[in-house]
């Protein structure tokens, strides 16, 4: 078993200002997205559409607003609506954590629609250009989750090579023991807990880096190197992310205040299903519509 390093959540201190790893990873993610975007400017079919480095910089401004506002509101509405309706001022306490990818996705989509309207472009042309830039940011964000030792995975066999002990999960681990007696006996978890006061879990943040970040990046980057029908790159992102997130959720610990929902699926899985379906519909629409020269 591997013990999570339990990093200090503060990366650096600048006088009275504490720069946290999670915020730093957001910055790294946006910078990585800009780098990917500038690489894409060199593709002939992208350059032919008149994209410039300034467009990317302006787009990132919209993207930051969409990510932060949408991510926070999505968490409030999708995950803890009852709490925040009772404590509305707590919505603004972003330093206490609480961001939703699906909310951030909706926020960024709306931001890109606004950007497209201002630049008099088709909004799908904008999202097709942006889609390959997103996985780099997702990977950085999940790395921030791992450094913080949060959003850990479900309990697993202590003999599994991926088994990891998360100090931040101690309280959850103690409660888990009484709820799953069969697995406690099967995996001899009582002995493990006696020794470490923790239970072995999937490092699901690393799975998400691998699937939602690295794998999805390469799929989108190489798919978009050639001209594609309008909406095709965006559709592949929806399908790819939705499938990756849906899969990883089987290894990720559900939010304790929600648990598993209908059909034994998590909130993340239920929110990913519409993405997959929308992606399939958009892909079919794009290829039926053609023309390839409209692609990003």
Swiss-Prot record:
<keyword id="KW-0812">Transmembrane</keyword>
<dbReference type="InterPro" id="IPR001640">
    <property type="entry name" value="Lgt"/>
</dbReference>
<feature type="transmembrane region" description="Helical">
    <location>
        <begin position="59"/>
        <end position="79"/>
    </location>
</feature>
<feature type="transmembrane region" description="Helical">
    <location>
        <begin position="97"/>
        <end position="117"/>
    </location>
</feature>
<keyword id="KW-1133">Transmembrane helix</keyword>
<dbReference type="Pfam" id="PF01790">
    <property type="entry name" value="LGT"/>
</dbReference>
<comment type="function">
    <text>Catalyzes the transfer of the diacylglyceryl group from phosphatidylglycerol to the sulfhydryl group of the N-terminal cysteine of a prolipoprotein, the first step in the formation of mature lipoproteins.</text>
</comment>
<feature type="binding site">
    <location>
        <position position="142"/>
    </location>
    <ligand>
        <name>a 1,2-diacyl-sn-glycero-3-phospho-(1'-sn-glycerol)</name>
    </ligand>
</feature>
<feature type="transmembrane region" description="Helical">
    <location>
        <begin position="265"/>
        <end position="285"/>
    </location>
</feature>
<comment type="similarity">
    <text>Belongs to the Lgt family.</text>
</comment>
<keyword id="KW-1003">Cell membrane</keyword>
<protein>
    <recommendedName>
        <fullName>Phosphatidylglycerol--prolipoprotein diacylglyceryl transferase</fullName>
        <ecNumber>2.5.1.145</ecNumber>
    </recommendedName>
</protein>
<keyword id="KW-0997">Cell inner membrane</keyword>
<feature type="transmembrane region" description="Helical">
    <location>
        <begin position="230"/>
        <end position="250"/>
    </location>
</feature>
<comment type="pathway">
    <text>Protein modification; lipoprotein biosynthesis (diacylglyceryl transfer).</text>
</comment>
<keyword id="KW-0808">Transferase</keyword>
<dbReference type="GO" id="GO:0008961">
    <property type="term" value="F:phosphatidylglycerol-prolipoprotein diacylglyceryl transferase activity"/>
</dbReference>
<dbReference type="GO" id="GO:0042158">
    <property type="term" value="P:lipoprotein biosynthetic process"/>
</dbReference>
<keyword id="KW-0472">Membrane</keyword>
<feature type="transmembrane region" description="Helical">
    <location>
        <begin position="129"/>
        <end position="149"/>
    </location>
</feature>
<feature type="transmembrane region" description="Helical">
    <location>
        <begin position="203"/>
        <end position="223"/>
    </location>
</feature>
<feature type="transmembrane region" description="Helical">
    <location>
        <begin position="17"/>
        <end position="37"/>
    </location>
</feature>
<dbReference type="GO" id="GO:0005886">
    <property type="term" value="C:plasma membrane"/>
</dbReference>
């Amino acid at each position: 078993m591997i013990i999570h390093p339990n990093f200090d959540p503060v990366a650096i201190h600048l006088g009275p200002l504490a720069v946290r790893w999670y915020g730093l990873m957001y910055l790294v993610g946006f910078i990585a997205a800009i780098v990917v975007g500038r690489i894409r400017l060199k593709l002939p079919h992208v350059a032919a559409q008149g994209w410039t480095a300034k467009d990317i910089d302006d787009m990132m401004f919209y993207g930051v607003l969409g990510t932060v506002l949408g991510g926070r509101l999505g968490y409030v509405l999708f995950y803890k609506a009852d709490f925040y309706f009772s404590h509305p001022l707590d919505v603004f306490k972003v330093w206490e954590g609480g961001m939703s990818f699906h909310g951030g996705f909706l926020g960024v989509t709306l931001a890109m629609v606004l950007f497209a309207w201002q630049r008099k472009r088709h909004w799908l042309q904008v999202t097709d250009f942006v889609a390959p830039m997103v996985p780099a940011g997702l990977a950085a964000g999940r790395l921030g989750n791992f450094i913080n030792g949060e959003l850990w995975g479900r309990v697993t066999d202590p003999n599994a090579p991926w088994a990891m002990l998360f100090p931040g999960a101690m309280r959850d681990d103690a409660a888990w023991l009484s709820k799953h007696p069969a697995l406690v006996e099967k995996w001899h978890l009582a002995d493990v807990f006696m020794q470490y006061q923790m239970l072995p879990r999937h490092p699901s943040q690393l799975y998400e880096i691998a699937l939602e970040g690295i794998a999805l990046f390469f799929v989108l980057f190489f798919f978009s190197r050639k001209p594609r029908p309008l909406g095709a790159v965006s559709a592949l992102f929806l399908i790819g992310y939705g499938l990756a997130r849906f899969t990883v959720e089987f290894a990720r610990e559900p939010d304790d205040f929600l648990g598993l929902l209908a059909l034994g699926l998590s909130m993340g899985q239920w929110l990913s299903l519409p993405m997959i379906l929308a992606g399939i519909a958009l892909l079919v629409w794009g290829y039926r519509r053609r023309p390839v020269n409209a692609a990003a």
